[in-house]
Amino acid sequence: MPTLLLGAAIPFGTIAYTLFIFLLLLVMLRKFAWGPLMGIMKEREEHVTNEIDAAERSNAEAKKLVEEQREMLKQSRVEAQELIERAKKQAVDQKDAIVAAAKEEAESIKASAVQEIQREKEQAIAALQEQVASLSVQIASKVIEKELKEEDQVKLIRDYIKEVGEAR
C-alpha cells in the first residue's frame, strides 16, 4: 500500500530506493569528484598564492633595483660635477700660469728693449760728440787759422765736450 508523502502518492520503497541512490551518489561524488576537485582547487589556491608571493618578491626586488639605480645615477652626477669643478679649477690655474709667464716674458722683452734703447742712445751721443768735435775743430781752425795744431784743437774740444757732458 502506497504511503502518502506530502499529499502525493509515492510508494515508500521508491522513496527509500531514491534516498539510497542519492546517498550512494553523494558518497561516490565525494570520493571520486569532490575530493579530487577540492584537491585541484587547493593546488590552484596554493599556486595562485605562490604566484602572488613571487610577484610581490619580484616587485620588491624591482623597487630595490630602481632605488640602487637612482643612487648610482645620483653618485654619477656627483662625480661628474666634481670632475667638472676640478677641470674648471685646472683651467683657471693653467690660465693664471700662462698669463704670469706672458707678463714675465713681456717684462723681459721690455727690459731688453730699454737696454737696447739706452745703448743706441749712448752710441748716438758718442757719434754726435764726435761730429760736434770734428765740426768744432773745423770751425775753430778756420777762425784761428792755424794758431794751434789740429791735434791740440781736437783734444781741447773733446775735453770741453766731456766737461759739458759730465756737468749735465
Curated annotation (Swiss-Prot):
Recorded GO CC terms: plasma membrane; proton-transporting ATP synthase complex
Chief place where the protein resides: membrane
Localization of this protein: Cell membrane
Pfam families to which the protein is assigned, alphabetical: ATP-synt_B
GO molecular function: proton-transporting ATP synthase activity, rotational mechanism; proton-transporting ATPase activity, rotational mechanism
InterPro entries: ATP_synth_B-like_membr_sf (IPR028987), ATP_synth_b/b'su_bac/chlpt (IPR002146), ATP_synth_F0_bsu_bac (IPR005864), ATP_synthase_B_chain (IPR050059)
Family: Belongs to the ATPase B chain family.
Subunit-structure text: F-type ATPases have 2 components, F(1) - the catalytic core - and F(0) - the membrane proton channel. F(1) has five subunits: alpha(3), beta(3), gamma(1), delta(1), epsilon(1). F(0) has three main subunits: a(1), b(2) and c(10-14). The alpha and beta chains form an alternating ring which encloses part of the gamma chain. F(1) is attached to F(0) by a central stalk formed by the gamma and epsilon chains, while a peripheral stalk is formed by the delta and b chains.
Protein name per Swiss-Prot or TrEMBL: ATP synthase subunit b
Organism: Bacillus cereus (strain AH187)
Record lineage: Bacteria, Bacillati, Bacillota, Bacilli, Bacillales
